[in-house]
């Protein structure tokens, strides 16, 4: 079977990619997620007045923790030694939303895109969890890879991120 999917062998069976022969290079990935809230919920979040406490600090910690565990929760992902992981927030009051940007880095022979994506998703889920007592219809959207650099495939920028 001829497949362009890297996690399938010649017979179409699922397999973990052998990255042992790949060159170790600096790998960087940035992903985003957007959390849409009602104005009153965002106001409580920013005032640190929600019942569960400081939402953004917990979301940052949760996202970083998730980035470090991707090899355990995403099938066929290699466990990586991250050299850097960070979560940044861009808060908008109109429309009321929080844009999450997750950045991950390593020096290794496989990329860190999944680590960045899972970190952004998890930070968004933490925000949902900590705000759900006051709002159940929170929307998590626009989870995507914005940028990756390093390795054989080179650099990628999401189409609307091109300069």
UniProtKB/Swiss-Prot annotation:
It catalyses: (8S)-3',8-cyclo-7,8-dihydroguanosine 5'-triphosphate = cyclic pyranopterin phosphate + diphosphate. Substrate binds at residues 76-78, 114-115. GO terms for molecular function: cyclic pyranopterin monophosphate synthase activity. Signal peptide: none annotated. One of its GO terms (biological process) is Mo-molybdopterin cofactor biosynthetic process. Belongs to the MoaC family. This is Cyclic pyranopterin monophosphate synthase. It comes from Desulfovibrio desulfuricans (strain ATCC 27774 / DSM 6949 / MB). The lineage of its organism: Bacteria, Pseudomonadati, Thermodesulfobacteriota, Desulfovibrionia, Desulfovibrionales.
């Amino acid at each position: 079977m001829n497949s362009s999917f890297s996690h399938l062998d010649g017979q179409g069976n699922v397999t973990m990619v052998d990255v042992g022969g790949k060159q170790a290079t600096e790998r960087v990935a940035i992903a985003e997620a957007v959390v849409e809230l009602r104005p009153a919920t965002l106001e409580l979040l920013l005032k640190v007045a929600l019942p569960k406490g400081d939402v953004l600090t917990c979301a940052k910690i949760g996202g970083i923790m998730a980035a470090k565990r991707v090899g355990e929760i995403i099938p066929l992902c290699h466990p990586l030694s991250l050299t850097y992981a960070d979560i940044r927030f861009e808060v908008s009051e109109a429309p009321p939303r929080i844009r999450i940007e997750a950045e991950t880095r390593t020096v290794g022979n496989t990329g860190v895109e999944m680590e960045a994506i899972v970190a952004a998703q998890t930070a968004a889920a933490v925000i949902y969890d900590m705000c759900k007592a006051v709002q159940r219809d929170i929307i998590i959207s626009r989870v995507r890879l914005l940028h990756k650099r390093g390795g054989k495939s080179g650099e990628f920028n999401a189409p609307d991120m091109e300069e």
